Amino acid sequence: MSIDTYTETLKINQLIEKATSHFQLSSTQLYKKILKNHEGELTELGAINVKTGKYTGRSPKDKFIVTEPSYKDNINWGDINQPMDEETFLKLYNKVLDYLNQKEELYIFSGYAGSDKESRLKLKVINELAWHNLFARNMFIRPESIDEAQNIKPNFTIVSAPHFKANPKLDGTHSETFVIISFKHKVILIGGTEYAGEMKKGIFSVMNYLLPMQDIMSMHCSANVGEKGDVALFFGLSGTGKTTLSADPKRKLIGDDEHGWNKNGVFNIEGGCYAKAIHLSKQKEPQIYNAIKYGTILENTVTNDDGTIDFDDNTYTENTRAAYPIDYIENIVTPSKAAHPNTIIFLTADAFGVIPPISKLTKDQAMYHFLSGFTSKLAGTERGVTEPQPSFSTCFGAPFLPLSPTKYADLLGNLIDIHDVDVYLVNTGWTGGKYGIGRRISLHYTREMVDQAISGKLKNTKYIKDDTFGLNIPVQIDSVPTTILNPINAWNNKDNYKAQAYDLIQRFNNNFKKFGKEVEHIANKGAFNQ
């Protein structure tokens, strides 16, 4: 399917052309509306703080894709991509449009997803809430003028009605909340939730369909570029250090979360950043902290009467967020695109303490680890003992992938081949024992290893293949103790290390079985100890 198809616009145009619909308001104009409507409050730093109500994160069980004949055979149906028939969708869609038509004011934004013009999606966003429209303005790519915005004919339209509550019995939803993607009607329909991240991730899901169908890779990763134009991609789940490691003063940021990779190189899908704000401090994350200023939206942070912000207070949620335009960060590439990657870093926080701090992957190993998407999370048990739990998220972004995972893995494998990309697996987790016994790998050492991988110093260094995982481990890395490079050497009891390692290998193998026979060739060559 080509990106160059358009939203059916008859009813949508009626909403846009209403006398009380506000088109392409500036940040200041939206601030005035937000404050007048009591949607948010001004903070000491100049940002607007809003509350999203009972939904402080995404609602994955309420996300649907419409089963339209031209598209249904391409979708990887299941718990993530839940089907909704077209008749049910259209009934609800028209109810929402009629509901919005009764609203006194609406807010319209026109812009883009995709900073490479050859692969960009033209967007229109229709919002019930002014702060949601500011979120769209911050997160998507902004046109350079009102004239340009007015001439955008949308390939996809977000219709957002957070105060419209669905009736599951009548509307075919699971709850009052719904996020529905229709590839035929080119619409993302959102209702029953004020969590603005549904708009961002809805468009990412759309791009994860449209781009790969044109053999363009879409990726849930951060990306940066060095002074010589060398590009690095960082894949990793929450808590692996993706944001920290890709924010490098020596390199410019391309983007922090969503990217495409086409024949021209890597490009950011977004025009903004949606950063976690819990425990944010100027000392630890100055780039993000300095972006909390006029024009930025804070979600669910706690403010005091004097407008000061307590970033450590999780009263409403651990998932507090800041949404700001990418140009609020100083060290960025403009526009947000660069050449083909030289280096890919897969980040994992292994709380079992057995995966090497860094290893160089073959193409088959890269595809295996991309499909696995492993990290570990710490879950409290009934007796209060904290044990590591393995966590696998296919392609490091399972909730946002409409197509079969193998489509993304095959695209990545081909691109690694074509552009001779070096791929490294970096463990930012534990060494010398599992969580509670071992210690966290020093961030200083991790930075040193990543820096040398990206600079090319590790490309032709000497490697040994470890007996346990079959991974290629560097024999020596400048400024990093050799004792930590091979994890077995950091454990006092080698038998305990092997038992823990083989347990993790079995978990990987069990997880990989879900992909079936179509990935046997990857498992045979890329799995541990192959």
UniProtKB/Swiss-Prot annotation:
One of its GO terms (cellular component) is cytosol. Keywords: ATP-binding, Cytoplasm, Decarboxylase, Gluconeogenesis, Lyase, Manganese, Metal-binding, Nucleotide-binding. It is found in: Cytoplasm. It catalyses: oxaloacetate + ATP = phosphoenolpyruvate + ADP + CO2. ATP binds at residues 201, 220, 236-244, 285, 321, 440-441, 446. GO terms for biological process: gluconeogenesis. One of its GO terms (molecular function) is phosphoenolpyruvate carboxykinase (ATP) activity. Mn(2+) binds at residues 201, 220, 257. It is an enzyme of class 4 (lyase). This is Phosphoenolpyruvate carboxykinase (ATP).
